[in-house]
Amino acid sequence: MIIFQRAKDTEARHNKQPYDIMDFKKRLFVGLLFTLTAALTVTAAPRSKAAIKAIAAKVFKQSPTLMTTRASKDEPRALLANKAFTVMGYDNGGFVIVSNDDLLPDVIAYSNTVFDKNTNNENFKWYLSAAEEAIKDIVKSGKPRTMVPPDQSKYAAEIPSFLTARWGQEKPYNDLCPEGTTSGTGSWQGYGSTGRTLTGCVATAMAQILYYIGWPEHGIGTHSVNVKQADGSKKKLTVNYEESVYDWGNMIDSYRGHYSKEQGEAVARLMLDCGVAADMNYATDGSGTFTENACQGLKRNFGFPETIQMLKRRRYTEKAWMDIVYNELNERRAILYTGVDLKNGGHAFVICGYDEAGKVWVNWGWEGSADGFYDIALLNPRSMKFSDDQDMIIGLEGEKAELVQDTVTVETPGTLDTLIADSTKSMISLLKVNGKINSSDLRTIRQIAGNNADGTIQRSSLATLDLSDAVIVSGGEPYIVDGKRELTTKDNEIPERAFFNCRSIRNL
């Protein structure tokens, strides 16, 4: 987590002055008038349980993000409820956060992941806590809140998530992190007091963005941090970035299953270098740093230009802030976003997409846990004390890799995969396919478009797909495996789900 310095509380000073009985009556009348006026303006109407359930069911039915999670025919049930919102979903995955009052938009967030009310995902817990406070504050004020959707005269109506990594802070990500001890600020994450330190959520966010960019090939210069030891001493750790070669080809989207030694070492090297560049305060119970340090480290050790910026939320109106967010995401630039928790410090995560309503896709940096669309603008620091330190780093793009435009003619159905080199699949921006193609070929096209048959996501540059001179035929391996369902092609028919969740394709 990020460690923020907290300002000391100050007491307001009140000068008591005498007043006469008429002044008292005036004050009393004004006070009563204000109370009555306030009571009249509060028109909050709590949503019934039936209404909340209906809202969630509608989202599950209509949202592409949640369609694949509806394995059960049962209605979603309440997984968590408080005075501000209700989390509706399924035990096997998929949840919707519904506001309990109609002063707010009905849906606060939704995700296709499993909701765990006892999660140790500190970033997600921060959002739940902050959203609860924000909703209570809005209901208390009696002023309705509307979202700021993307201006479709300037931006795309929606940008599907384009970040494919689902990384975390423990093994193998922290395999090269230094040995250390606890931070001394609490052991809320429950890890041991001595041993291997965690990467820190700032480093994980940085690393996921660099992996998405696939740049640079190596770092610049050297940098050092001091790591606290169990005996109270500090041990200096130095990284020579000139010797760090980033093995992008051996990094994978998820390390939750099997991975090779080389794949583990590749991501561990990147994580360490990100942490040191950001002046990480390494600890076994939570490593932290400031957003400013991450921004400077990206410039100093990774070669990012001076044009990258760290912006503070409290300096912008909600509309202006979200306009910056939409602009970055339209340019396919991931945003490193941070928010403060007055109890547990700060939290860093990645924003990498948005829906038509203006909810942004959040990658919490917890191996995919709770990733989904969230109303981040709800947390307005101009009216809520808790979010005074929301920041974001924008302008994060590296040197563009040379993309490929390819035309392939399939002579024998099912052979498309053999006609395109694996090393170029992620770099194809325009693909034209001629000839007869079957289900196996469609499976390959979906893979190039960033979506494997089992639904896992991988890096993709494919923006334009041309099948105008292709003929769909039956046969081949299934192009989608959804539970027990295996979808295959039929003659002269493009299946409805042929390109479902192929997030990179913009022209077909």
Where are these regions (language model features)?
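Active-site-adjacent structural segments surrounding the nucleophilic cysteine of cysteine proteases
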Residues: 104-287
